[in-house]
Curated annotation (Swiss-Prot):
The modification N6-acetyllysine is found at residue 544. Its EC number is 3.1.13.1. Changing residue 766 to A: Becomes unstable in stationary phase. Changing residue 280 to N: Loss of RNase activity, but exhibits helicase activity. Stimulated by the presence of a monovalent cation. Highly unstable in exponential growth phase. This instability is due to the binding of SsrA/tmRNA and its associated protein SmpB to the C-terminal region of RNase R. In contrast, RNase R becomes stabilized upon entry into stationary phase. The difference in stability between exponential and stationary phase is due to the acetylation of a single lysine residue. Residues 792-801 have a biased composition (Low complexity). 3'-5' exoribonuclease that releases 5'-nucleoside monophosphates and is involved in maturation of structured RNAs (rRNAs, tRNAs and SsrA/tmRNA). In stationary phase, involved in the post-transcriptional regulation of ompA mRNA stability. Shortens RNA processively to di- and trinucleotides. In vitro, exhibits helicase activity, which is independent of its RNase activity. RNases 2 and R (rnb and this entry) contribute to rRNA degradation during starvation, while RNase R and PNPase (this entry and pnp) are the major contributors to quality control of rRNA during steady state growth. PROSITE patterns: RIBONUCLEASE_II, S1. Its main location: cytoplasm. Residues 644-725 form the S1 motif domain. This is Ribonuclease R. Keywords: Acetylation, Cytoplasm, Exonuclease, Hydrolase, Nuclease, RNA-binding, Stress response, Virulence.
Length: 813
């Protein structure tokens, strides 16, 4: 144990420490063959019953997590020595599946026979095999490490007197038998929640019991209910949390204000959307006499009310983030905090954490300091109001006269910060997002495009600056904290993206490792193209997903060496942990001893941060998937009434079985199946992202403008089928390049910008982001998958829904 480099860490956690996981893995790596538990106990100098029991538990935990394999000879071995991998099962509605292994580019194929030993969502240990006759690399399931134990949502049916549930998630390709005494009063076609009592095997069917009946009226509310349960999102407040918040008052206690910097006279304001209910950030800036600005970013002091290890903290950590569905919000914190005590509502005292910064006239962050304060927001402003004020709206300028000059100064600061972002090469995404407008029945009445103006971007730049300051502060002090990490795109993703661009007459410079600046200039060069939104989406897909991690590797998209989330502790748990770390450091500077402070500061260990990073990243992905499910259902529900109508759109994706079309202004995608095209054999060119008719020569390519008719809506699969009316070839290389635009300058150009690339930049990009020489992209292998027709169940449900609506409409008339 004395050679264990993690001995001190283990001694901090356990009174009678045992070798760390890392040391056990290192020991087995040096060993030529697997070892039994008794052999490991001798070789690792384990003594006494307590240590032996600790070793037994640790080995079992390492086996559960896939770090070790327990062989038939009762020995522990390294999975890589046995050519085994750990991964997550991804099911398919046709019975087969895939194994997603972290760190591998391609998923491994699981045959329908292998899928009988596991279900979608299981974490398994598997053995990679050779390729099948279709060239797919297969895998054999060795053991289920962590079975999917969550509840399953589906519809209840009866057939020949036997009750069963068909899962709503098509990746669960099995029915669940329900014994007669476990039905809970569900009737034919009802949406129910099932708990498995017997998992499906090669010889037996799945058996379960109904634990909740959601009803048969499938609407927006039920779509949210299904998503919450399918993705295991916590939505019920535990009784202990209810009890903890029951004693909270609406006003900030006077004793809480003591010892804080008083900023109540500083004209801080909140700027949010019209429908926002929780306000966690306020801003103010003023011009410095010598040039540049002083910027105050005040953030709600959630950490004062949510203390570590309390029921409230445990539930906030469990949720990880607030989940914003189109029609409702599942908050991370109870409403008394999120919309009350922690929300920076106007004209009331609130506790806050402040990041006060100095910014040079060139937009360079020259200084920052953090402190705890008390504030009173001088106004609750909206993006629309601020934009109109900046545009000269006289009525609003009179209404908010005392604040106008401060808002104009914020706008001046924004313009400098925006230019500084361009100089360092940060990528600016101008995404078009859909906003659903609901009617009285909570169905989509229409879909509108959200408009981003300088007020949105102004707040965004202020928040980025505060996040950078927070990241630098904890990093300089070497304090364990969660950084917001955006890794560089993989070489394969870059090659694939560059191939698509080449087909469209575009180019991404930078070789195999393009810099953020290369992506930013590409986006600027295509800004005026009709397919700009599609290209931006493809660019995003070519990049890696941002995560939380205590190991700082920089933020590629923003071209920053250090970045963390500090500005939204009401709705993001990583921000709350960062506030605690900053408070701990501030108290430590004043000579405070111990891991906790009087106002909610806390010192986390690196081990805690590693676990939190994984959990918070998972919670973010979980929320994204759930909201996407509901949005897809709402879009399908909206399109049910559009069957037979004709729309214009653009080809957004091409596959071997057809192409997807994104409808103009609606942001809704549907499939034109290859079988519905002209009578011809179509070949899929994956590199060129196009379908080509062998006889006619007709080509359908990414970016082509098309006119389509809505043929069918598959509510079960959340998919929409189109048929092609006409198509128009997308022009190649439309729009000036960034270099050509720069020659003409900015004068008289609507929305145009000249990218200034100088030697001195605002924030020096990580050296890992620097480019290399260009390499020719490799051609990808062809793919030819077939689409499936809607299931009989789907057609039944869709027909019943349509008939029900028609009947309601008739009664109303």
């Amino acid at each position: 144990m004395s050679q264990d480099p993690f001995q001190e860490r283990e001694a901090e956690k356990y009174a009678n420490p045992i070798p760390s996981r890392e040391f056990i893995l290192e020991h087995l790596t040096k060993r030529e063959k697997p070892a039994s538990r008794d052999e490991l106990a001798v070789e690792l100098h384990i003594e006494g019953e307590e240590q032996l029991e600790g070793l037994r538990r640790r080995l079992r935990a390492m086996e559960r997590d896939g770090q070790l394999v327990f062989t038939r000879r009762q020995c522990y071995a390294l999975p890589e020595r046995l050519d085994l991998v750990k991964g997550t099962v991804i099911g398919h509605r046709d019975g087969y599946g895939f194994l997603r292994v972290e760190g591998r580019k391609d998923d491994l194929y699981l045959s329908s026979e292998q899928m009988k030993t596991c279900i979608h969502g299981d974490q398994v240990l598997a053995q990679p095999l050779g390729a099948d006759r279709k060239g797919r690399r297969e895998a054999r399931i060795v053991r289920v490490l962590v079975p999917k134990t969550s509840q399953i949502v589906g519809r209840y049916f009866t057939e020949a007197g036997v009750g069963f549930v068909v899962p709503d998630d098509s990746r669960l390709s099995f029915d669940i038998l329900i014994p007669p005494d476990q039905i809970m009063g569900a009737r034919m076609g009802f949406v129910v929640v099932v708990e498995l009592t017997q998992r499906p095997t090669r010889r037996t069917k799945a058996v379960g019991k109904i634990v909740e009946v959601l009803g048969d009226n499938m609407g927006t509310g039920m779509a949210v209910d299904i998503a919450l349960r399918t993705h295991e999102i916590p939505y019920i407040w535990p009784q202990a949390v209810e009890q903890q918040v029951a004693g909270l008052k609406e006003e900030v206690p006077e004793e809480a204000k003591a010892g804080r910097v008083d900023l109540r006279d500083l004209p801080l304001v909140t700027i949010d959307g019209e429908d926002a209910r929780d306000f966690d950030d306020a801003v103010y800036c003023e011009k410095k006499r010598g040039g540049g600005w002083r910027l105050w970013v005040a953030i709600a002091d959630v950490s004062y009310y949510v203390r570590p290890s309390t029921p409230l903290d445990r539930e906030a950590r469990n949720r990880g983030t607030s989940v914003y569905f189109p029609s409702q919000v599942i908050p991370m914190l109870p409403e008394v905090l999120s919309n009350g005590l922690c929300s920076l509502n106007p004209q009331v005292d609130r506790l806050c954490m402040v990041c006060e910064m100095t910014v040079s006239s060139k937009g360079r962050l020259t200084g920052y300091k953090f402190y705890e304060a008390v504030m009173s927001s001088h106004a609750r402003l909206t993006y629309t109001k601020v934009w109109h004020i900046l545009q000269g709206d006289q009525d609003l300028r009179e209404q908010y006269a005392p604040l106008v000059k401060h808002l104009e100064e914020l706008h001046n600061l924004y313009k400098v910060l925006d230019k500084a972002r361009e100089e360092r090469g940060g990528i600016s995404f101008e995404s078009e997002e859909a906003k659903f407008i609901f009617n009285a029945e909570r169905r989509i009445e229409r879909i509108e495009q959200t408009q981003r103006n300088d007020a949105h971007k102004l707040i965004e730049e202020c928040m980025i600056l505060a996040n950078i300051s927070a990241a630098r502060f904890v990093e300089k002090a070497k304090e364990p904290a969660l950084f917001r990490i955006h890794d560089k795109p993989s070489t394969e993703a870059i090659t694939s993206f560059r191939s698509v661009l080449a087909e469209l007459g575009l180019e991404l410079p930078g070789g195999n490792k393009p810099e953020p600046r290369d992506y930013a200039e590409l986006l600027e060069s295509v800004a005026d193209r009709p397919d700009a939104e599609m290209l931006q989406t493809m660019l995003l897909r070519s990049m890696k997903q941002a995560i939380y991690d205590p190991e700082n590797r920089g933020h590629f998209g923003l071209a920053l060496q250090s970045y963390a989330h500090f500005t939204s502790p009401i709705r993001r748990y990583p921000d709350l942990t960062l506030h605690r770390a900053i408070k701990y450091l501030l108290a430590k500077e004043q000579g405070h001893q111990g891991n906790t402070t009087e106002t909610g500061g806390y010192h986390y260990s690196m081990e805690e941060m590693l676990q939190l990073g994984q959990h918070c990243s998972m919670a973010e992905r979980r929320a994204d998937e759930a909201t996407r499910d509901v949005a897809d259902w709402l879009k399908c529900d909206f399109m049910l009434d559009q069957v037979g109508n004709v729309f214009k759109g653009v080809i957004s994706s091409v596959t071997g079985f057809g192409f997807f079309v994104r409808l103009d202004d609606l942001f809704i995608d549907g499939l034109v199946h290859v079988s519905s095209l002209d009578n011809d054999y179509y070949r899929f060119d994956q590199v060129g992202q196009r379908l080509m008719g062998e006889s006619s020569g007709q080509t359908y390519r990414l970016g082509d403008r098309v006119e389509v008719r809505v043929e069918a809506v598959n509510m079960d699969e959340r998919k929409i089928d189109f048929s092609l009316i006409s198509s128009e070839r997308a022009p190649r290389n439309v729009g000036k390049t960034a270099r050509e635009k720069a020659k003409k300058g900015d004068a008289g150009k609507k929305g145009g910008k000249r990218r200034q690339v100088g030697k001195k930049v605002n924030f020096e990009p990580d050296s890992a982001f620097r480019g290399e020489k260009k390499t020719k992209p490799k051609a990808a292998k062809k793919d030819a998958r077939k689409a499936k027709k809607p299931s009989a169940k789907t057609q039944k449900i869709a027909a019943a829904t349509k008939a029900k609506r028609a009947a309601k409409k008739k009664v109303a008339e």
